[in-house]
Each structure stands twice: as C-alpha cells, then as structure tokens.
C-alpha cells in the first residue's frame, strides 16, 4: 500500500494542525507568573490583616473575615475557574502595613487582601486591582480635648501605623506646617488606637473608615471624635505582583463582572450597612459619591485627582 500523502492532503493536515494550536486551551507549560505558581502548587497565598476592620481582620474565633478578604476569596474562585482546577487551597498569611509589600514581591503572598492605599509611589513596586473602596485620611481624638484640626495638635504626640501612606503624609505635614508634633509608628491599627485610648497619644491619624470602625467597637464610642478635616483621598485596592499581566487580567475581569452584576454592592452592604463581627456593630457607612463613580467607571488609578466628586 502506498502510504504517501498527496500534496493536497499534506496541506490540509498543516492547516488543521495550525488551527488546533489556537483551539487548545493553555497548559501549565504555557502559564507564567502567578498563574503558573498557583497551578504548580495547587494553592494561592492570600495576605490578610489582623485588625483592619471591616476590611480584613480576625473575628472572635480567630477566623479571617471582612469586605476585602471576602472579595479576595471570590477572586481566588475566578483564578481556580481560569485554571480549570477541581480545588484550590487558600493559604492565609497574616501581614502588616510594614511587611505586606516585601512579602508580595518575594512570593510570600500572591494577593494582598487588606486596606491598602493605591498610590503612584507604590505602583513603582507593585500592581493593584481595580479600586474597591475610597476613603480619606483624618484623625481621631478624645472628644473632651476638642481637637478640630491638625493645627490644634501642635506640639502633641500623634500616632499612626508603621508602613502606611498616612504616617508619611502626617510626617510631611508636620514639617510643612512646622507643628512640632512627635509622631510615633504603631505596629497595627489596634495598637495605635489603644495609644489614644490610654492617653499615650493625643490623636491617631489613619483612613477614616478604619478609625470609625475602631471607635464603633471600642468600650466608649461616644468619647471619641473624628476630624472633619480630610488630609488626603485614599483609594483602596488589593496588591498583586508588578509585571504579571496575565494574572492581573484574570483578577480585573472578575472584578469587572462583580461591578456589573451587583455583587460589589451586596458585599458593601454586608460589611458597611449591617451588623458585623465581633460585636455585631453596624458601621452605617453608605457608599460614597467617589466609590459610586468607581463602580460606574472602574479604575486602578493611584492618582487622587481621579477620585474627585
């Protein structure tokens, strides 16, 4: 039997092979960056906070909960679906404001699920998801002291959390305005608030939603006041490794779908407008005009000007 193919048959085989190359889904060998790491290990490492209520924190049972954490869990579902994996282990890694970026860039975590401000300086080191919250830097103090503005804190001791954009901002304003404040870095938000609670600091400068949450679950919420003066606009996003476009596309596409189908509003309502652990306190913080703008026109911009009313 003559097993040689005619030229026309050879041409058909070549065309079929070429088309098949496009039709076959990507294999583990085709994957790069975080997607390859997740596929190879069967797990995704999620960096969470310990006391960033209501975004990412421990409840009374030491279970990680929160708005940003639940959002990240849904994003992990999207990664699992993209990679066609039957199961995907979530490895939970506690991070702080000071170590979250080093842990991400070194591969210790794959996606950071906390309360991190997306700004142009951080974008030099990492990438961000689409913005999932917009807040502002303010300070909390004891109502009895009647501190209305940053200028009222001249010569006082101020605390902020180490490794945050807030402590850098307040340090800069302290110099610019010649306020002579003593600025102390705290390990985390809970420790910083405790310093105000115990009169070791006159005020705690941080994102308003975080300090509002700490006040709400404190022993005497009525004893504190949050400044009306806003020192900066702070858009939140979850961090992922820089220069990893395939992973970012999966994450961004999943978030776009949640913005479109109303999932993001449902998550927001759950964590900001209803009772939350550990004390079943309702924060009662409606969606801001800035965040409504983001939901309508999603962005990962780190420029505060893009979040103006």
Go through each PLM region and give its residues.
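Periplasmic-binding protein-like
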Residues: 50, 133-141, 216-252, 274-297, ...
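Ligand-binding clefts/hinges and TM-proximal coupling segments of bilobed small-molecule sensing domains
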Residues: 29, 166-183, 222-223, 256-309
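Short helix-initiation/N-cap motifs at beta->coil->alpha
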Residues: 31-32, 85-102, 145, 183-195, ...
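Bilobed "Venus flytrap"/periplasmic-binding protein-like clamshell domains
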Residues: 45-54, 64-81, 117, 134-189, ...
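A ligand-binding cleft/hinge motif common to bilobed small-molecule-binding domains
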Residues: 99, 113-124, 168-176, 194-198, ...
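Extracytoplasmic small-molecule ligand-binding "clamshell" domains
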Residues: 30-32, 37-112, 261
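Acidic, polar ligand-binding/catalytic clefts
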Residues: 73, 84-152, 292-302
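Extended ligand-binding regions for polar small-molecule ligands
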Residues: 29, 70-78, 151, 156-157, ...
